[in-house]
């Protein structure tokens, strides 16, 4: 009787393990549309009237968050904000968020987290857009890597060789 009970427990355990394997084998978390590059430079200060844009080809099926790294030179006496947007190739807004500039930490990741997961954009061109609505300066700079000479982004009307330090998190 004891052998029969042990055998049933072993068979049930194996069944449960295989069930979980087959249920979750297709679900993987992909951390990064590309690896976040090591910062080698920073843009000029983000000021009113300047829009920073980085286009990229998305490879993540379900986008759940995007991280961007900022640098800062000073904290403000007046309140200022930063807006981060994610747009599709037709300039349709997929998600956006406004941040108080003083809440953004030096060389830490700032996360753009859509309310709902963004799906259906694998292989599509997406654009990150960063700007301020404040009339004063922000004390913030976007970090980027200038090691990739094939890539570029816009700082206002100026094309800068390199890639903004960002990553995309989601399910593949």
Label each PLM-derived region with a short phrase.
Residues 2-90, 104-125, 131-172:
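Beta-sheet-rich sandwich/jelly-roll-like modules and their strand-loop junctions
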Residues 90-99:
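Surface-exposed loop/edge segments in extracytoplasmic proteins
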